[in-house]
């Protein structure tokens, strides 16, 4: 085959056994043979096996041929041939002037129809748009003689020459320091500059005053939104020239406001209270944070008391401590300092606990809500009612009768109670909880007779 010449180090064999060269397209003869076989009706897979060319290469060549009609390879990694020749550019300009609303794809089809370009040299749609944008529609600042579109302009339509635009000669010609300002592009002479330079040695220029030169120059004709004049910058820089951190030192402007927010007596009293909390002292606090706030102060401490709980005679099988439900086992005794505080509740042992609060409640008042984690005590019929105010919300013992509950508890539930609707019981989908009778014994099947 004509394409089986292999360069050392740059070629090889494909999966079909055909030779190829890396980075080089198929020869023209092989491309034409692929197209001829496709015209004869040979399938691309058969063309690939017969010519020993990969299926992807065959599909790419045929797809490009069906789309553009060309079998020439595309250039990879190189520059494309110049399609925007002067003749093509002039034709595109003529089409655009005749019909300004013509689209780029219509211009491309017209170039092919009139034979200006062929399938290989016709510019793409993006190239035509670029030609119209850069060459047909001449920019405003280019000379007139280089514009192709101005050759057929009517006498009544003229363009402003570029010499009418007077760009700024230097950045100093613009009063605002910008070369591309509106006044510079429009050629408007700017009046005297209203800017003044800041004197670095003047540290007392923080007052809001207008310079005599700035006031005499008249109103400003052009105000830029992205820059501020020195007249506007001076008031903004005044606080920073005085001090960078206004909260670091007290200034006359902040003194009145701080005195209104934080009175001096209140600050002093707060500091004294803070010192009292840091140092241990037995003296009660006598000063509050403010006059309208009051706090209760414990004036007289009480003598320590202990609660002694004795084990009842009835043995208990639980490992938890007995509830202080009966007043017969409670006794308030004043103990000395030698009694250690309790840490646990061992079963069948005496428990001592010290309380240094206010006057303790009576033995019966310690039950109920005062013991968290235990249910409220319900007295029996033999025990009297509670007269303490600590458990006033509970029901008195006299209201409970010693008799047992009159109604018998339910040991089982009937079907009618569980399903009040009788239609559910008669439904074939309902299965009763009663045991079903066992199935009758079946007779001997046919397997027994075999």
Swiss-Prot record:
GO cellular component: chromatin; nucleoplasm; nucleus
PANTHER family, A to Z: PAIRED BOX PROTEIN PAX-6-RELATED-RELATED, PAIRED BOX PROTEIN PAX-8
Keywords: Congenital hypothyroidism, Developmental protein, Differentiation, Disease variant, DNA-binding, Nucleus, Paired box, Phosphoprotein, Transcription, Transcription regulation
Chain positions covered by the region annotation RED subdomain: 87-135
Chain segments carrying region PAI subdomain: 12-68
Single annotated GO MF: DNA-binding transcription factor activity, RNA polymerase II-specific
Region Disordered, annotated ranges: 159-222
UniProt-reported outcome of changing residue 40 to P: In CHNG2; loss of activity
Annotated protein name in UniProt: Paired box protein Pax-8
């Amino acid at each position: 085959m004509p394409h089986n010449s292999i360069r050392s180090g740059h070629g090889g064999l494909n999966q079909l056994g055909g030779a190829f060269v890396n980075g080089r397209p198929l020869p023209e003869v092989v491309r034409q043979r692929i197209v001829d076989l496709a015209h004869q009706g040979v399938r691309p897979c058969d063309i690939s096996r017969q010519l020993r060319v990969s299926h992807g290469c065959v599909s790419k060549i045929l797809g490009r041929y069906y789309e553009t009609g060309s079998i020439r390879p595309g250039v990879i990694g190189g520059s494309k041939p110049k399609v925007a020749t002067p003749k093509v550019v002039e034709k595109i300009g003529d089409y655009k002037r005749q019909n300004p609303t013509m689209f780029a794809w219509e211009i491309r089809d017209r170039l092919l129809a009139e034979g200006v370009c062929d399938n290989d040299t016709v510019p793409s749609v993006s190239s035509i748009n670029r030609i119209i944008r850069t060459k047909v529609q001449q920019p405003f600042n280019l000379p007139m003689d280089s514009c192709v579109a101005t050759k057929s302009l009517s006498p009544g339509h003229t363009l402003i020459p570029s010499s009418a635009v007077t760009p700024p000669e230097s950045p100093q010609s613009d009063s605002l320091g910008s070369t591309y300002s509106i006044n510079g592009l429009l050629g408007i002479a700017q009046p005297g500059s209203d800017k003044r330079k800041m004197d670095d040695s003047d540290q007392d220029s923080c007052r809001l005053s207008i310079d005599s030169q700035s006031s005499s120059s008249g109103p400003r004709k052009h105000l830029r939104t992205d820059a501020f004049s020195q007249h506007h910058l001076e008031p903004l820089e005044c606080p920073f020239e005085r001090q960078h951190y206004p909260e670091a030192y007290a200034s006359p402007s902040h003194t009145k406001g701080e005195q209104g927010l934080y009175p001096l007596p209140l600050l002093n009293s707060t500091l004294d209270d803070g010192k009292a909390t840091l140092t241990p002292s037995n003296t009660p606090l006598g000063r509050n944070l403010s006059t309208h706030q009051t706090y209760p102060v414990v004036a007289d401490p009480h003598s320590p008391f202990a609660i002694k709980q004795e084990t009842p005679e009835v043995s208990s099988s639980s490992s938890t401590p007995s509830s202080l439900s009966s007043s017969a086992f409670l006794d308030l005794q004043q103990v000395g300092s030698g009694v250690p505080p309790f840490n646990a509740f061992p079963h069948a042992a005496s428990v001592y606990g010290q309380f240094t609060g206010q006057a303790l409640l009576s033995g019966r008042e310690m039950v109920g809500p005062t013991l968290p984690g235990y249910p409220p005590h319900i007295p029996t019929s033999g025990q009297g009612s509670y007269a303490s105010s600590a458990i006033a919300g509970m029901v008195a013992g006299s209201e409970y009768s010693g008799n047992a509950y009159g109604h018998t508890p339910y040991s089982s539930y009937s079907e009618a109670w569980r399903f009040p609707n009788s239609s559910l019981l008669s439904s074939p989908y309902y299965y009763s909880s009663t045991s079903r009778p066992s199935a009758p014994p079946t007779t001997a099947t046919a397997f027994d007779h075999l």
